[in-house]
Amino acid sequence: LCRLHVPDLTAVRLAQQLLAGTVKPGGLYVDATCGNGHDTLFLCRLAGPEGHVIGLDIQPMAVQATNTLLAQNGMDRIGQAILADHRDLLRFAPAGSADCVMFNFGWLPGAAHTVHSQAEASVAAVRAALEALKPGGVLSAVLYSGKVIGRSEKQAVLDYLQGLPLTRYTVLVCRFANWAETAPLPCLVFKRPAGQ
């Protein structure tokens, strides 16, 4: 399932490898925090020519960077970034329609840290994403804490995920035992098929 060499291991790469071993080509994929577009591009490659990828971000420069990256890589027929809040995800991926939803919380790399995801909005976005997932679908979230953004978002999302009913979801939290407490934290949520 995971084929990384230790020097290449990051929280984002781990989440990507876990998704790559889980999802199948085709279907609907959502990058709920598209940033510079690297996760959106990753999802386009997973989705393949039969799939469709939607990237969401509240910053115009993130949407532009993502759409440029997709075009440069010939993926603009598969994926598109849209200027929208991740809490509004259900407008673009109705309930039960998404195979995969990916979050990489925090701030836009290379931009001012004054604009970053917030606890209340992030929990609402995760709740919407879980509703958007098909049974058998998967959500990934990389959570951050630190000097700039504090701990509230990471803790709020973790608390929400840990409270999900086991009858409907399996939650995987990948802690790196010898990394700093503020290190990025990859999490995966598998939505169980009905009757399992």
Regions found by a protein language model. Name each.
Residues K24, A47-G48, L133-P135:
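Helix-to-beta-strand junctions that scaffold the AdoMet/dcAdoMet cofactor pocket
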Residues G27, R91-C100:
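A short acidic, Gly/Pro-enriched loop at the edge of an enzyme's catalytic core
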Residues L1-L28, H38-L41, R45, Q64-A95:
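S-adenosyl-L-methionine
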Residues H52-D57:
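Conserved SAM-binding motif I beta-strand of class I
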Residues M102-A125:
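Mobile active-site "lid"/loop adjacent to the S-adenosyl-L-methionine
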Residues K147-Q196:
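Class I S-adenosyl-L-methionine
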Residues T33, G136-L143:
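Conserved beta-strand signature within the Rossmann-like core of class I S-adenosyl-L-methionine
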